[in-house]
Amino acid sequence: MVPGPRPALLLLLFLLQAFLLWDSPVAASIQEQYCESLLPTTNHTGPQCNASVDLIGTCWPRSAVGQLVARPCPEYFYGVRYNTTNNGYRECLANGSWAARVNYSQCQEILSEEKRSKLHYHIAVIINYLGHCVSLGTLLVAFVLFMRLRSIRCLRNIIHWNLITAFILRNATWFVVQLTMNPEVHESNVVWCRLVTAAYNYFHVTNFFWMFGEGCYLHTAIVLTYSTDKLRKWMFICIGWCIPFPIIVAWAIGKLYYDNEKCWFGKRAGVYTDYIYQGPMILVLLINFIFLFNIVRILMTKLRASTTSETIQYRKAVKATLVLLSLLGITYMLFFVNPGEDEISRIVFIYFNSFLESFQGFFVSVFYCFLNSEVRSAVRKRWHRWQDKHSIRARVARAMSIPTSPTRVSFHSIKQSSAV
């Protein structure tokens, strides 16, 4: 007995035959019948386009010539899901044939939750890079201005200068972290990557302690009414640069013994070594808010009627510190906020946090340097001095100041006449 053909082979031959006949008149008739069976019947008189199926699989019904036909977007195409509430468009041409090109431009892909998360993550990364670039650029300009303008180098501006320096170093180490840390480095947990993390956290802490120095200076000058001449630069150097160092050393020792993995980034469940440096940051932030509450209270009561230039400077400094402390406080407290499971809340949290975290340096340079009236006045004087030195008017004035009269008697002629 000769065995008959297998069912799988018959199915393969049938599919092959259907594929070969797809563009044939027989296939066109099958397509037309298929579309007519799926779509409601439409009666048209005159020239018309027959029902057809395009390469994507969308059925286009029998339509009158010149008509722009709309059909829902395909639900799936090449494994990608699309929004079927939008439409694709195809024109029935005057010769009774369908346009070769179908307009599927309004068909949008329905992103999965994983794809949406990746998209928002990439946008947040772009915001972070943009913000840190802008911040670093403006901070460097502010640093150069404070360095060059020696006429405004008082204790208050020296504190501003050091705060800007701390932000520059923090932004620079952020770029080092982003450009050198990758999954392989994280897993290797080499010494240099742990040192980079420690340096970044150190400069992060110095930002808060220099803000604390700003608050201490204003509180001493306004609330305690001490003469600021009694304050010394070394006191603020100790607050801003020295105190954070043992804090980070203690944190590094804790990480080394209890959480020594992934270049000391992140934290394991049940391990709280990061609070060694986060705790002091929160503490000085709260103390600064108390300082500013007292400062604002004094300014609103005792100094309201005063219009001296020193009081105006204090008021501007308080406004800048209030804004910056709010920014620093909000961004840091956001790390302790749970945005919840709602997708919109998480998206807002990601973007808001990325923006404030990356643009902090920009706000610091704007409020403490570019809007500082002393800096602006000194820059204006420098600019006018430079203009006077290099202007054509100055050259002409210098040239005309030289005596050129024909009655001028030279020293040589006097010498000759006396000799005679």
Swiss-Prot record:
Residues 29-116, 180-194, 259-274, 337-343 are extracellular. InterPro entries: GPCR_2, GPCR_2-like_7TM, GPCR_2_CRF1_rcpt, GPCR_2_CRF_rcpt, GPCR_2_extracell_dom_sf, GPCR_2_extracellular_dom, GPCR_2_secretin-like, GPCR_2_secretin-like_CS. Residues 1-28 form the signal peptide. The chain crosses the membrane at residues 117-147, 155-179, 195-223, 231-258, 275-300, 312-336, 344-373. One of its GO terms (molecular function) is corticotropin-releasing hormone receptor activity. Interacts (via N-terminal extracellular domain) with CRF and UCN. Its main location: membrane. One of its GO terms (cellular component) is plasma membrane. The keyword Membrane applies. The transmembrane domain is composed of seven transmembrane helices that are arranged in V-shape. Transmembrane helix 7 assumes a sharply kinked structure. It comes from the Eukaryota. GO terms for biological process: adenylate cyclase-activating G protein-coupled receptor signaling pathway; cell surface receptor signaling pathway; cellular response to corticotropin-releasing hormone stimulus; corticotropin secretion; regulation of corticosterone secretion. It is a multi-pass membrane protein. Belongs to the G-protein coupled receptor 2 family. This is Corticotropin-releasing factor receptor 1. It comes from Gallus gallus.
